[in-house]
UniProtKB/Swiss-Prot annotation:
Role: Regulator of actin cytoskeleton dynamics underlying cell motility and adhesion. Functions as a component of the WAVE complex, which activates actin nucleating machinery Arp2/3 to drive lamellipodia formation. Acts as a regulator and substrate of nonreceptor tyrosine kinases ABL1 and ABL2 involved in processes linked to cell growth and differentiation. Positively regulates ABL1-mediated phosphorylation of ENAH, which is required for proper polymerization of nucleated actin filaments at the leading edge. Contributes to the regulation of actin assembly at the tips of neuron projections.
Chief location of this protein within or outside the cell: cytoplasm
Organism (species): Homo sapiens (Human)
CDD domains per the UniProt record, alphabetical: SH3_Abi2 (cd11972)
Protein's name in the database: Abl interactor 2
Gene designation per UniProt: ABI2
Subcellular location: Cytoplasm; Nucleus
Residue ranges, annotated region (Disordered): 167-431
Domain SH3: 451-510
Record-listed Phosphothreonine modification sites: T361
Family listed: Belongs to the ABI family.
């Protein structure tokens, strides 16, 4: 500030005065030089003196101008710096004023609001009462809890047909069914094993019959005696019987048990009927009233003699009596018709009513069991099919030859866990078995195509939506002749050809015993 004041008050005004003085001096010097040149005799000397004065005058004027210009520029720089300082101060003052205005505005806005009561507490608060730790209790693992979840192996049920009609016909062709039949009950195991109540009957070798023995179909009408070595009740063996089977149907032999079967096919609905335990002594028949029974300790006692021929009136009675006895749960056999009485003092004895006989002997209705249905036409015409199936049980004219003793128990090899061994009087138990027609063990029906891709069984009910489709129930047998890329199959069922969704059926699986 002092420097600027000195410049403004001393140096700059001094420089200006020096310039004015130089101006006056230059005029006097010019007059002197002019007069000297005119008056001097030595013109050359006067000229040189004039040149010297001129040079000195120019130099002094230039110095004075330079000094004054420097002082002015220095004054301008000082003033510019002062202006910048003043500008900064003004900006600071303006910002301070703005801040003050903001504070005042916020204060005015805060007046219009209400106070909020905030409680100053910790974010995490420890519970007042600590929970007591729960003692660990080990629970046994339930391996069957997930058996009904997921897409596991679909086991085909052989002797059970669902009575609920799940109409899946409205589903799109590419979408699998969203419902499936209820899962079968588990019998104490994690998965369906070989001892499941729905599995196929175990293959059992048929009893051996002597060559000189001729089966008698009317022996079912004779008194019988239970073998003394029998220790297992018939009810202890899981057996399933079909009401649609005929007396000439195939027996569940090793061929029928080698298939994985489910449902009843298109033959009929199978009905599970438990085999009742035979009573120790049957009521005395009308034809042998007053006759004492045979002793129970005689395992090889001779059979009671029966007439060689049966009256013709017994055939319709036996055929007509089959249905009510079946419905009654096998209450008791029909009283036998005999012409000779058993020996005195012996109890009734049980014998097998099913014997493997000659394959060329035609079956007769009169010799059927009292609780069996009369043989159907298909069972009589499918005699040749029995060559590939189990032992054929036929009814022949009566014979007086006594039956052989029960065969010795033969071992049956099976996978683990093995089934319980059959009792020694197994063929006596076979006498109470109702024959059924196995749609999987028999040969293909007449309406089956000569060549087909595979044989499938329906696992859901389906109602057709179009004319070229098939409608079927669960358990129906279909022969697939073509598989389309869109998931639909073309097959034959009961002689009718049509389309059906491939996800509603499943191939009949085979397994080796």
């Amino acid at each position: 500030m002092a420097e600027l004041q000195m410049l403004l008050e001393e140096e700059i005004p001094g420089g200006r005065r020096a310039l004015f003085d130089s101006y006056t001096n230059l005029e006097r010097v010019a007059d002197y030089c002019e007069n000297n040149y005119i008056q001097s005799a030595d013109k050359q000397r006067a000229l040189e003196e004039t040149k010297a004065y001129t040079t000195q005058s120019l130099a002094s004027v230039a110095y004075l101008i330079n000094t004054l210009a420097n002082n002015v520029l220095q004054m301008l720089d000082i003033q510019a710096s002062q202006l910048r300082r003043m500008e900064s101060s003004i900006n600071h003052i303006s910002q301070t004023v703005d801040i003050h205005k903001e504070k005042v505005a916020r204060r005015e806005i805060g007046i219009l609001t209400t106070n909020k009561n905030t409680s100053r507490t910790h974010k995490i608060i420890a519970p007042a009462n600590l929970e007591r730790p729960v003692r660990y209790i080990r629970k046994p693992i339930d391996y069957t809890i997930l058996d009904d979840i997921g897409h596991g192996v679909k086991w085909l049920l052989r002797f059970k047909v669902s009575t609920q009609n799940m109409k899946m016909g409205g589903l799109p062709r590419t979408t699998p069914p969203t419902q499936k039949p209820p899962s079968p009950p588990m019998s104490g195991k994690g998965t369906l094993g070989r001892h499941s109540p729905y599995r196929t009957l175990e293959p059992v070798r048929p009893p051996v019959v002597p060559n000189d023995y001729v089966p008698s179909p009317t022996r079912n009408m004779a008194p019988s005696q239970q073998s003394p070595v029998r220790t297992a009740s018939v009810n202890q063996r899981n057996r399933t019987y079909s009401s649609s089977g005929s007396s000439g149907g195939s027996h569940p032999s090793s061929r029928s048990s080698s298939r994985e079967n489910s449902g009843s096919g298109s033959v009929g609905v199978p009905i599970a009927v438990p085999t009742p335990s035979p009573p120790s002594v049957f009521p005395a028949p009308a034809g042998s009233a007053g006759t004492p029974p045979l002793p129970a300790t005689s395992a090889s006692a001779p059979a009671p003699l029966v007439p060689a021929t049966v009256p013709s009136s017994t055939a319709p009675n036996a055929a007509a009596g089959g249905a009510p006895n079946l419905a009654d749960g096998f209450t008791s056999p029909t009283p036998p018709v005999v012409s000779s009485t058993p020996p005195t003092g012996h109890p009734v004895q049980f014998y097998s009513m099913n014997r493997p006989a000659s394959r060329h002997t035609p079956p007769t209705i009169g010799g059927s069991l009292p609780y069996r249905r009369p043989p159907s036409i298909t069972s009589q015409t499918s005699l040749q099919n029995q060559m590939n199936g189990g032992p054929f049980y036929s009814q022949n004219p009566v014979s007086d030859t006594p039956p052989p003793p029960p065969p010795v128990e033969e071992p049956v090899f099976d996978e683990s866990p093995p089934p319980p061994p059959p009792p020694e009087d197994y063929e006596e138990e076979e006498a109470a078995v109702v024959e059924y027609s196995d749609p999987y063990a028999e040969e293909d029906p007449p309406w089956a195509p000569r060549s087909y891709l595979e044989k499938v069984v329906a696992i859901y009910d389906y109602t057709k939506d179009k004319e070229d489709e098939l409608s079927f129930q669960e358990g129906a047998i279909i022969y697939v002749i073509k598989k389309n890329d869109d998931g639909w199959y073309e097959g034959v069922m009961n002689g009718v050809t049509g389309l059906f969704p491939g996800n509603y059926v499943e191939s009949i699986m085979h397994y080796s015993e």
